[in-house]
UniProtKB/Swiss-Prot annotation:
Summary of subunit composition and partner proteins: Forms a homodimer or a heterodimer with a related family member. Interacts with nlk.2.
Subcellular location: Cytoplasm; Nucleus
Pfam families: SH2 (PF00017), STAT_alpha (PF01017), STAT_bind (PF02864), STAT_int (PF02865), STAT_linker (PF21354)
Domain SH2: 580-670
InterPro entries in UniProt: p53-like_TF_DNA-bd_sf, SH2, SH2_dom_sf, STAT, STAT3_SH2, STAT_linker, STAT_N_sf, STAT_TF_alpha
Residues in coiled coil: none
Gene name as annotated: stat3.2
Designated name of the protein: Signal transducer and activator of transcription 3.2
GO biological process terms held by the UniProt record: cell surface receptor signaling pathway via JAK-STAT; defense response; growth hormone receptor signaling pathway via JAK-STAT; interleukin-6-mediated signaling pathway; leptin-mediated signaling pathway; mesoderm formation; neural crest cell differentiation; positive regulation of DNA-templated transcription
GO MF annotation terms: DNA-binding transcription factor activity; DNA-binding transcription factor activity, RNA polymerase II-specific; protein homodimerization activity; protein kinase binding; RNA polymerase II cis-regulatory region sequence-specific DNA binding; sequence-specific DNA binding
UniProt source species: Xenopus laevis
UniProt keyword terms in alphabetical order: Activator, Cytoplasm, Developmental protein, DNA-binding, Nucleus, Phosphoprotein, SH2 domain, Transcription, Transcription regulation
Length: 766
């Protein structure tokens, strides 16, 4: 089915967008009348080659004539009238610039294809939510769209005035030359000069009208350029700047950035209007060369107008060249802007001016630290070479929406080795994870006689040589993008600015919400604030230095706040993601708050919190019980670290955990997850079900194997009567373990037993 026919079957919301694609410059009636022929032509090629554009344009006029003949046979007067009007408009507008109409048609066809793909994708996903324009348009953006429409209307109005002034000038030129030839003949024949004087007066009136119209056009052009400048400032200094800031926030775990498509449509529309206006200004030069006079406003103002429109277009093109996807290693998608030497990373650039004639015309080159040069050496920073495919041609085929982009998928960095191990200066004040580097993308655009150098940069990246440097490198990325929107401040960490707790708290919550389904609660953040700033009532506005966040050890600990927190984030992602998403892990809670929550609860109530003493990240559970006298006791088990969680899931540990009482009986102290969720309801679904089938001996005469399960046991007394091996007895006698957390209640050490189960009761919980 032809593309145009498919478009007619779309929902109303898509048809409204289709109507917005067409204007007087390429009427929708013509698209309807000649749909199959239009779709069969290579308009993008015509937009880049004038000879082919001329051929296609004349073929278009021929197709219009054939269609007109059909309407003539059908006696369809209305369609005849519309088609005749369209042909006259095309001839008067594009006969001398056929590449212009080719570019307009090519863009419309691209936009149609993108709209069709969007509609199909939305239908497959079950609704309009997947639509790229589904994002809410603010009142400010609605005003911006209105300003863009006003600009387009002014451009079209000027186009009509240009035709009027051209016709008036042609009439004046013809009458002037006619009068001049008649005057010369009259002088030779000695005829009466009164007729000549009368015609001279008519010419003067025509010249006055021509001058007035020229001045009106000059004034309108100046007003139009001011309107364009206003819209462009809104687009580049506000909308595009806002998008870049949102991209920064998204890079460090904040809300996902919005799609660039709407911004691309706005910028492309403005660029098209600017190019059309430039053609109008150049047309003024042609008119001036044909007819000029003393005080001609074209002579006075045209050079300034052309210089101004060219400058606007250059600046718009430069601003429209952006990094759509920041550098990122595929194995660490949640931590962009950190690159390890020798490991491939990807990034993507995009030009937000979607001209089909630029498809496969722009060759992008990528380099690193282009502007640093000797400055980097003075700072003592390392230097790198980019390996892999570091050049690529921008095209519209690789992207889903037909945008003009280039994606680099196979880039790696290699350090330039110096005599002192790559450091250009042994007095460097920054550690390697505080060094910031810029990846630069550059190209040249040749369009309608203009050469424009385009250059854009990634956000600053941190380059590491060992994956163990990742935590500190990511801390640098967080701190930078949290506190500045300067995209090129590579000296940021020579004097890192101070952050406030409000800023830090938001970013810390993002570290959880970006990789899980749950961020941090106010109570959890308050506990973290206490870890960073000490006891307090209100932490809002409290200042936090870079050193306190990442470099200095916490009070009484041998590690920094960030190292501790980053390991806990890793612990959650790798070992207890589902439990965190369910909200079962309180995690960050003070000892005092923990006791206050558990004390009024019935025995067996427990909660899950993170260890404060484990650098590598640990989690423990604390429960409430009653002693013989009925006094409330708060007990905690020694934290489980990644080493133990590699062997058994945390849910299985909780479900199987026992304590050994004074009579050597194994009992479970964990009954209800705080506040009152039965343990089996919370954790049972996350335990691996016992297989009903088990391997039997191949020899029929051999007794069946006994099945086994692992359970964690905490002894409460050292006078154990249960028969056990000497090794197990020695382990029990070593209780309590060294390095356990102190604080509220007793800290229990856990023993792991391999218990034999008869096959008939193997599936029964203990």
């Amino acid at each position: 089915m032809a593309q145009w026919n498919q478009l007619q079957q779309l929902d109303t919301r898509y048809l409204e967008q289709l109507h917005q694609l067409y204007s007087d410059s390429f009427p929708m009636e013509l698209r309807q009348f000649l749909a199959p022929w239009i779709e069969s032509q290579d308009w993008a090629f015509a937009a880049s080659k004038e000879s082919h554009a001329t051929l296609v344009f004349h073929n278009l006029l021929g197709e219009i004539d054939q269609q007109y003949s059909r309407f003539l046979q059908e006696s369809n007067v209305l369609y005849q009238h519309n088609l005749r009007r369209i042909k006259q408009f095309l001839q008067s507008t594009y006969l001398e610039k056929p590449m212009e109409i080719a570019r307009i048609v090519a863009r419309c066809l691209w936009e149609e294809g993108r709209l069709l793909q969007t509609a199909v994708a939305a239908a497959q996903q079950g609704g309009p939510a997947s639509h790229p324009n589904a994002a809410v348009i603010t009142e400010k953006q609605q005003m911006l769209e209105q300003h863009l429409q006003d600009v387009r209307k002014k451009v079209q109005d000027l186009e009509q005035k240009m035709k009027v002034v051209e016709n008036l000038q042609d009439d004046f030129d013809f009458n002037y030359k006619t009068l001049k030839s008649q005057s010369d003949l009259s002088e030779l024949n000695g005829n009466n000069q009164s007729v000549t004087r009368q015609k001279m007066q008519q010419l003067e009136q025509m010249l006055t009208a021509l001058d007035q119209l020229r001045r009106t056009i000059i004034s309108d052009l100046a007003s139009l350029l001011s309107a364009m400048e206003y819209v462009q400032k809104n687009l580049t200094d506000e909308e595009l700047a806002d998008w870049k800031r949102r991209q920064q926030i998204a890079c460090i775990g904040g809300p996902p950035n919005i799609c660039l498509d709407r911004l691309e449509n706005w910028i492309t529309s403005l660029a098209e209007s600017q190019l059309q206006t430039r053609q109008q200004i150049r047309k003024l030069e042609e008119l001036q060369q044909k007819v000029s006079y003393k005080g001609d406003p074209i002579v006075q103002h045209r050079p300034m107008l052309e210089e101004r429109i060219v400058e606007l277009f250059r600046n718009l093109m430069k601003s429209a060249f952006v990094v759509e996807r920041q550098p990122c290693m595929p194995m660490h998608p949640d931590r962009p802007l950190v690159i390890k030497t020798g490991v491939q990373f990807t990034n993507k650039v995009r030009l937000l001016v979607k001209f089909p004639e630029l498809n496969y015309q722009l060759k992008i080159k990528v380099c690193i630290d282009k502007d640093s040069g000797e400055g980097a050496a003075l700072r003592g920073s390392r230097k790198f070479n980019i390996l892999g495919t570091n050049t690529k041609v921008m095209n519209m085929e690789e992207s889903n929406n037909g945008s003009l982009s280039a994606e680099f998928k196979h880039l790696t960095l290699r350090e330039q080795r110096c005599g002192n191990g790559g450091r250009a200066n042994c007095d460097a004040s920054l550690i390697v994870t505080e060094e910031l580097h810029l990846i630069t993308f550059e190209t040249e655009v040749y369009h309608q006689g203009l050469k424009i150098d385009l250059e854009t940069h990634s956000l600053p990246v941190v380059v590491i040589s060992n994956i163990c440097q990742m935590p500190n490198a990511w801390a640098s990325i967080l701190w930078y993008n949290m506190l500045t929107n300067n995209p090129k401040n590579v000296n940021f960490f020579t004097k890192p600015p101070i952050g406030t707790w409000d800023q830090v708290a938001e970013v810390l919550s993002w570290q959880f919400s970006s990789t899980t389904k749950r961020g941090l609660s106010i109570e959890q953040l308050t506990t973290l604030a206490e870890k960073l700033l000490g006891p307090g009532v209100n932490y809002s506005g409290c200042q936090i230095t870079w050193a306190k966040f990442c470099k200095e050890n916490m009070a009484g600990k041998g590690f920094s706040f960030w190292v501790w927190l980053d390991n806990l984030i890793d612990l959650v992602k790798k070992y207890m993601l589902a439990l965190w998403n369910e909200g079962y892990i309180i995690g960050f809670i003070s000892k005092e708050r923990e006791r206050a929550l558990l004390s009024p609860k019935p025995p067996g109530t427990f909660l899950l919190r993170f260890s404060e003493s484990s650098k590598e990240g640990g989690i423990t559970f604390t429960w409430v019980e009653k002693d013989i006298s009925g006094k409330t006791q708060i007990q905690s088990v020694e934290p489980y670290t990644k080493q133990q969680l590699n062997s058994m899931s945390f849910a299985e540990i909780i479900m199987g955990y026992k304590i050994m009482d004074a009579t050597n009986i194994l009992v479970s102290p964990l009954v209800y997850l705080y506040p009152d969720i039965p343990k089996e309801e919370a954790f049972g679904k996350y335990c691996r079900p016992e297989s009903q089938e088990h391997q039997e001996p191949t020899d029929p005469g051999t007794a069946p194997y006994l099945r086994t399960m692992f359970i964690c046991v905490t002894p409460t007394t050292c006078t154990l009567d249960l028969p056990m091996s000497p090794g197990t007895f020695d382990s029990v006698m070593q209780f309590p373990g060294e390095g356990s957390e102190s604080g509220n209640g007793n800290q229990f050490e856990t023993l792991t037993f391999d218990v034999d189960l008869p096959s008939e009761c193997a599936a029964s919980p203990m």
